[in-house]
Amino acid sequence: MGKDQELLEAARTGNVALVEKLLSGRKGGILGGGSGPLPLSNLLSIWRGPNVNCTDSSGYTALHHAALNGHKDIVLKLLQYEASTNVADNKGYFPIHLAAWKGDVEIVKILIHHGPSHSRVNEQNNENETALHCAAQYGHSEVVAVLLEELTDPTIRNSKLETPLDLAALYGRLRVVKMIISAHPNLMSCNTRKHTPLHLAARNGHKAVVQVLLEAGMDVSCQTEKGSALHEAALFGKVDVVRVLLETGIDANIKDSLGRTVLDILKEHPSQKSLQIATLLQDYLEGAGRSAAVLEEHAQEDTAQETHLSSPAESPQKTKSETVTGELSKLLDEIKLCQEKDYSFEDLCHTISDHYLDNLSKISEEELGKNGSQSVRTSSTINLSPGEVEDEEEDPNSCGPTGLWEALTPCNGCRNLGFPMLAQESYPKKRNFPMEMEPSASLDTFPSENENFLCELVDTAVTKKPCSLEIARAPSPRTDNASEVAITAPGTSHHRNSSTGPTPDCSPPSPDTALKNIVKVIRPQPKQRTSIVSSLDFQRMNHNQEYFEISTSTGCTSFTSSPAASPPTSSVETTEVKNEGAEHADDLSQQEDDEPPKEYDAGQFAGLLHGSSPACESPENPFHLYGKRNTCEDGPDEASLANSPLPFKQTPIENNPEPSVKKVKPKVVSRTIFHKRNHQLENHTIVGTRMSRSGSRNGDQWGVNPGGFVERACTLGRIRSLPKALIDMHLSKNVSKSDSDLIAYPSKDKARVNWSKSSTAERSSKDNSERTPSFTSEWEEIDKIMNSIDVGINSELEGMNGETTRPRCPVQTVGQWLESIGLPQYENHLMANGFDSVQFMGSNVMEDQDLLEIGILNSGHRQRILQAIQLLPKMRPIGHDGYHPTSVAEWLDSIELGDYTKAFLINGYTSMDLLKKIWELELINVLKISLIGHRKRILASLGDRLHDDPPQKPPRSITLREPSGNHTPPQLSPSLSQSTYTTGGSLDVPHIIMQGDARRRRNENYFDDIPRSKLERQMAQTGDWGEPSITLRPPNEATASTPVQYWQHHPEKLIFQSCDYKAFYLGSMLIKELRGTESTQDACAKMRANCRKSTEQMKKVPTIILSVSYKGVKFIDAANKNIIAEHEIRNISCAAQDPEDLSTFAYITKDLKSNHHYCHVFTAFDVNLAYEIILTLGQAFEVAYQLALQARKGGHSSTLPESFENKPSKPIPKPRVSIRKSVQIDPSEQKTLANLPWIVEPGQEAKRGINTKYETTIF
């Protein structure tokens, strides 16, 4: 080694003495130590001494090495001997670049100030980066401060056109960003078309940096060729940044250079994050549209207040309205204050409830009494002309939902608790489904009802199913000029006003949970009402008795109403109905919450959760209402079966200011409404009516539909006629037209409870009502008809309620079903993917992930489909209710998949016992069933199976092919039966079974052992039996070099089962820089050192079971068998034994959430077991890789195993499994591993011993 190399090495290692010695001969002459001529000895020492600026092969000088390694004293010494600070290495880096990159502020100052050679702070490397770029990128704020003080130019851009501010924003260096924008605020306006600091920070999800940039004055809507910062945040799934940008007021409609908006980009990249971001965007767009509507309404309100002239009859109500308006104005101010200060939603609801109820109670009854019998003006009951209705619409402070909800809707927390978006519309034409408001009688009959009106509206809005509603008031063209109110659900009305904003597609977590939280604060009464419609009290206004029809369609509630044909009357009291479905749902939720926790200590296995797949977690369905079949039936039915009084319509009497009212005493009728769309007839809904008689039995509620009854009867396997008199009577009444979609029958017990409650209330109101003679005669006729058919109808409907079998004929096609829920555009999506029959699309068949996979990206539409599916019959699994098909053909015909019969038979699935053990992987790769709907139908029909029960294999096998092409299983060691690991538990019993199967497969009479049909025997004899196979490359061919030629296990072992090993879990370590096996070695050394520090630490080491399959590695607590975590095979990058202790091994996983790598370290019971685990991991990846290739070749890229569900644009990487020998051992130790089952070659057997290290690297 020459002196130059010695100097470089001394500078790198920090050997100050050696540097001093090597450079000491230069001191006197070079720095002018003497004035006379230099002695000859000194000149010779200079000639022989090292060059202080000498470089190595990378271009590093001694000063580079010292600056990079932080040797301050050597830097000073080198500068003292005139080392140059302005020599660049091969990549153009100067010593100041390296010091800044390292973050050593002292060395940076020395290089700048010490001399005699001074660093130039604006020097650039080959990538045009300055030292400020290096320091800013790695967040060295002290170095950045020094460089900025030295007037480093922060506008210099590197070869990627990035400034130091860009790099700091890109990597989230918050302090550096603050320092640079404080020193040079003009940098935020110096942007390129490629990027801006805001775009870079948004792309990587640095929320704090985004906020700092925006607060510093950066334009939130600045654009690049990729669009706005919102495009970047949405594309990379940064939900928090999207929220910040939207709150700042970014324009969500900006388009990128390709003309795409943010929503367009989200549609191109479907994922869970995309759905969340799309929901935020839609909420933002809806809020912006609503705010504009509020401003417009306020402007119209001012104009209307100046020009409107009220009649004398309206003046009393106007006085009261002004009083309420004054109080509500204070309330709205408090709501806005809540919004600004981000108060909790409970505080806001208390404000609404207390303020409104307290102030409305101040309105004295005397004031109402002064009105006499005059017709007063209210927002829902007054007889108004069309012009007056329009004026009233523009009053945002009225007692209706308009003013209150427009102020309340944007409040934080409203959407989370289930408040729908309410938008008021104005329609010039008559609606198809109006809620007709009848002319008002005297208001003094019920002076206290208005007090609860606002809360009733709030309660009603809150308790609807989670959907977006539109409440629209429209002028009525009827002769009595009564106003109309139509409340429609999306998808059911074709008259939506295009001026309203888009309806949010996201659904709140649970309507019943929201109701439970909200009713308590909005309506604090002794008896809380939990009805889905909150007991329709606001129609108890004596002047407003109309018929309500609550239709439940796919979880969304729509109110439609029509006048009922009945004689005039004064009032009828309303029956309260409690929603027991909500209480049941809450009970279900409580049961789930009360589930006992797992017994293992979470702290011991905390490291395993890094990079763990959420597959072990059971997702909690927020819609508890649809959790079980009973809830699925009862909840929606009770929403649609709310008991309401018989509607009475007051006949308008012209030329008479005071209508004459004659009291009658009718029997109160409880109505049960069933809806069924009939495409051949008009959408008539027939209402079955039961008379309430004291002392009579409490029968079931029932309903009939003349248009759809025969169809329903066919569904249930029986066709019968209905008495014509009953149909004619109901048709003549023309009660309502419904846009509802599904027949709903309540369960027997629930219906009887409801009937009992309603009968009690009806009997109490019977004495307070009278009937006119004509009305009496009509109902007497009804009574006779009811008595004649009562028993037959009830017994028949009891059979309907008890019927649980699958319908024998389809109720409707998929297209008709989708049209009924307002989503006909998805018919091709469902049909093309196997969801082609409504009978086989129940909740145990179709899931949200299925809809996402087939291309339904809109979360609101998926939610609507899933809620409608809850109302469809579930598939009947084999064995349910005695259903046991005797053959495969019979079973396939029963689920309408008879076309697959031949595929099942030729692949050996000849009996139902074999079918009950089939797995979805076999359906994809063996039976080639590519339609996900058909696969889900098959699995749902087979029912639930135990996970621990291995599937029975049909007479076919996935063979392991040797390089010679012979289709034989791997040759195992003859001493397999002797290699029993009593401690490790790794004896592979299925190997013996596999050998027997292989022998049978080689026997030409193999198929004679299995009972089969004539068709099967013919196919076996003619050679038509297809034997699908998966070919694994042997280890020595799949890797660069290895002494092993055969894998440890048969591939089916890793596909249908798993290989379980016991080991000790030592812990995990964060890998800052991924360096393959070096990283695993460092982690193993660190974990061993931690365990050796104390015996107490060793006692805490838990024992786990590693369950290895082609999907990945599951971690099972050996104590209680609970699954702790699961690492997918695609996230495992490297596995290796520790060279210092071969019984210790580790592998590296990637945590997808944090994007960090973690190394998990384990200790096996012996060296052999550690080697076997590492080899099994390599084989698991090879199996998964071959399965993925086979699935892709077969055109099933959308149905790959879950471990390979990557984006289609990325090719599947070829695995690099390297099992290499790194240590040669003494031949005397060769016999140690002679009996291992994976040792198959005697020649190779003698080449490996106990001290051999094997590594499996999987990338």
Curated annotation (Swiss-Prot):
Listed InterPro entries: ANKS1/Caskin (IPR033635), Ankyrin_rpt (IPR002110), Ankyrin_rpt-contain_sf (IPR036770), PH-like_dom_sf (IPR011993), PTB/PI_dom (IPR006020), SAM (IPR001660), SAM/pointed_sf (IPR013761), SAM_ANKS1_repeat1 (IPR041880)
Short motif Nuclear localization signal, span: 934
Localisation per UniProt entry: Cytoplasm
Q: Where are the ANK repeats?
A: 2-31, 58-87, 91-120, 127-156, 160-189, 193-222, 225-254
Query: Could you tell me which CDD domains the record lists for this protein?
Result: PTB_Anks, SAM_AIDA1AB-like_repeat1, SAM_AIDA1AB-like_repeat2
Q: Which controlled-vocabulary keywords does the entry list?
A: ANK repeat, Cell projection, Cytoplasm, Nucleus, Phosphoprotein, Repeat, Synapse
- The chain positions of domain SAM read 809-875, 883-948
Which residues, if any, are the signal sequence? none
At which residues is Phosphotyrosine found? 900, 1006
Give all cystine bridges in this chain: none
Where is there biased composition of kind Polar residues?
306-325, 371-384
Q: Which GO terms describe its biological process?
A: chemical synaptic transmission, postsynaptic; receptor localization to synapse; regulation of synaptic plasticity by receptor localization to synapse
Biased composition annotated in UniProt, kind: Low complexity: 556-574, 968-983
- Bias kind Basic and acidic residues: ranges: 575-587
* GO cellular component term, pick one: dendritic spine
The record's region (Disordered) falls at 298-325, 367-401, 490-513, 556-614, 631-661, 753-776, 943-988, 1196-1216
Gene3D superfamilies recorded:
Ankyrin repeat-containing domain, Pleckstrin-homology domain (PH domain)/Phosphotyrosine-binding domain (PTB), Transcription Factor, Ets-1
Summary of subunit composition and partner proteins: Interacts with EPHA8. Isoform 2 interacts with COIL.
Record-given protein name = Ankyrin repeat and sterile alpha motif domain-containing protein 1B
